């Protein structure tokens, strides 16, 4: 059964196509030939008695500071090794208006690059309700705004050829995160494939006293 996102207000459900790699997945994972075009569909449901506007945003996949793949829009800059940005090959409506208590299928148009390649183009389609204004004050009087969105991952490939993993260390620097001193290590995956279950072993030694060491 295909998974989908749902709140009391609205529902987002991908319509899985015939060229889906695994039809049990709750996101798009399609195989399409070079230069080919396809229209994917997502069903939106308005569960309220009020007209509703849903914003759509396309984004390329990225890896966050915790090593997790994210498919929603982010301020993380695209790596220079990114050859195909999903946003350049997928189009969708920017805003969809839903009448009260209705369902509507929307089209997501996909065009595969003309060049042949092995591996995957990865990204996502994010849906968010316009006019969210759920503001609350915490115990310290700080106002917190809660907004909700759903992201459907979209993976596109031309074939099932395996891609050998690769990993490059491009930069090391010091900095701060949440007031803590940290060592920033930039790892680059230049291939069009996921690197899963990766472990990092690091040793930090003092410059003037090599006996001072931290192991991670």
Could you say what each language-model-derived stretch is?
Residues 4-216:
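Long beta-sheet-rich domains in secretory-pathway and surface-associated proteins
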């Amino acid at each position: 059964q295909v998974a989908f996102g749902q709140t009391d207000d609205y529902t987002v459900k991908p319509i899985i196509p015939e060229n889906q790699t695994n039809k049990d997945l709750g996101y798009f994972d399609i195989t399409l030939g070079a230069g080919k075009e396809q229209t994917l569909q997502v069903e939106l449901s308005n569960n309220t008695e009020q007209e509703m506007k849903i914003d759509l945003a396309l984004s390329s996949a990225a890896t966050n500071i915790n090593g997790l793949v994210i498919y929603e829009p982010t301020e993380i800059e695209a790596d220079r090794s990114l050859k195909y940005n999903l946003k350049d090959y997928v189009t969708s409506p920017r805003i969809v208006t839903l009448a009260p208590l209705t369902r509507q299928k929307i089209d997501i148009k996909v065009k595969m690059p003309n060049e042949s390649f092995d591996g995957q183009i990865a990204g996502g389609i994010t849906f968010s309700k316009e006019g969210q204004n759920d503001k609350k004050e915490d115990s310290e009087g700080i106002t917190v705004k809660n907004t909700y969105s759903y992201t459907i991952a979209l993976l596109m490939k031309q074939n099932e050829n395996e891609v050998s993993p690769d990993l490059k260390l491009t930069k090391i620097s010091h900095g701060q995160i949440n007031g803590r001193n940290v060592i920033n290590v930039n790892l680059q995956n230049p291939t069009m494939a996921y690197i899963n279950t990766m472990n990092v072993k690091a040793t930090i030694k003092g410059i003037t006293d090599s006996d001072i060491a931290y192991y991670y």
